[in-house]
């Protein structure tokens, strides 16, 4: 029963004027059937995916961040302290042949709070009452029906935000025949009073919305029935609500001006929104780490265009960044910072860790001026940021352990400890992909573990496929307990690092 073939998505539209399939006990409201589709997933799968869709409205709308559940009759969990309860009670409906099982009120949180306001919405779950279904030849009820109701807390279509359909209510109905193991899913709309025959109702748009809602159920229902297992877990280190609220705040404050003033040749939107997301994550991470104590400062190694450093400093976090090459953007992002070697927040430096044995450069290798070098030693406690730092990525947990500094590493391109491009061994977990990126992430995590770090992994909510964040904020070993030279040898050694660093002086900056 779990291996039924998924049918192609070919919904059937109900013709205009079709009789309602849902009837309220009050007998007044007229629910309009919009479309339906055959399904091979049973009631328990429908109930499971509908609860997930209620808790995660972003699966249905790109305009939404999330939903905060502010009322749940079946839950004894307290409402989060930062969620304000409205005086509106749940807006439920009673349907003929159904018993209400659960009632929730969720607050829809939009991505753009400057354009759209949050909206409270009642969500209710129903099951058909015993004896209310069709009977088989033996006189037994053979049809199971499950219904989910959505009622926005708005008195008219004009008071609904952009991201919500201009309807008074939405119902999604699942019907399952236990004998034939065949079912249907359908979508139904309730229009606002006086608008049933009004010209202002955009039937074409409502049809598209119903199609999309049905398609989402079809996709997730068959995935659940087939035993789909989610591979990626977000919001492990920082709660989703806090990250999204901070990201929305930063985006509203800085995004427009940063995009308009972009000096690089790379795509401004990608870099601006990506770094705003990383900044939001770091700010909320630091909120937990440094509650009640002074922030120790940060250093962004391989800082690139310097935008992340700039955003964090605008938000009041002291720190600096360095890179092998100066960027155009530094002219507008650079500021004074007494904690850096030059007194500037952005500066050109080559990383030559003090732990690396001194090499005698050959005739073809450019001699590096000592004033252009940083030895990778930082004040104890400084938070190290390594965002797509490429050659510096595997060095991040090593430098962090030597200086006893917490860190975040967001890997991108694969380099070994000498700075050469290479492909790391496949991940230890055989269930993970064997791609070059997955291999790099696991390899860097292994280095971190050997340096004593308790590594936390966060899949960052940023517009990048390279969004894995490795966080080290707790080290189980003292620096004196770690044989760093043995660690370097275990992971390939460092012979040739000096000449590879010297080459960076001649190369063109990368655009990621």
Swiss-Prot record:
InterPro entries: tRNA_uracil_MeTrfase
Keywords: Cytoplasm, Methyltransferase, S-adenosyl-L-methionine, Transferase, tRNA processing
Top-level taxonomic group: Eukaryota
Biological process, per Gene Ontology: tRNA methylation
Coiled-coil intervals: none
One example GO MF annotation: tRNA(Ser) (uridine(44)-2'-O-)-methyltransferase activity
TM region(s), chain numbering: none
Subcellular localization: Cytoplasm
Catalytic activity: uridine(44) in tRNA(Ser) + S-adenosyl-L-methionine = 2'-O-methyluridine(44) in tRNA(Ser) + S-adenosyl-L-homocysteine + H(+)
Disulfide partners: none
GO cellular component, one term: cytoplasm
Free-text function comment from the UniProt entry: Probable adenosyl-L-methionine (AdoMet)-dependent tRNA (uracil-O(2)-)-methyltransferase.
Family indicated by similarity: Belongs to the TRM44 family.
UniProt name for this protein: tRNA (uracil-O(2)-)-methyltransferase
Organism: Gibberella zeae (strain ATCC MYA-4620 / CBS 123657 / FGSC 9075 / NRRL 31084 / PH-1) (Wheat head blight fungus)
Gene, per the UniProt record: TRM44
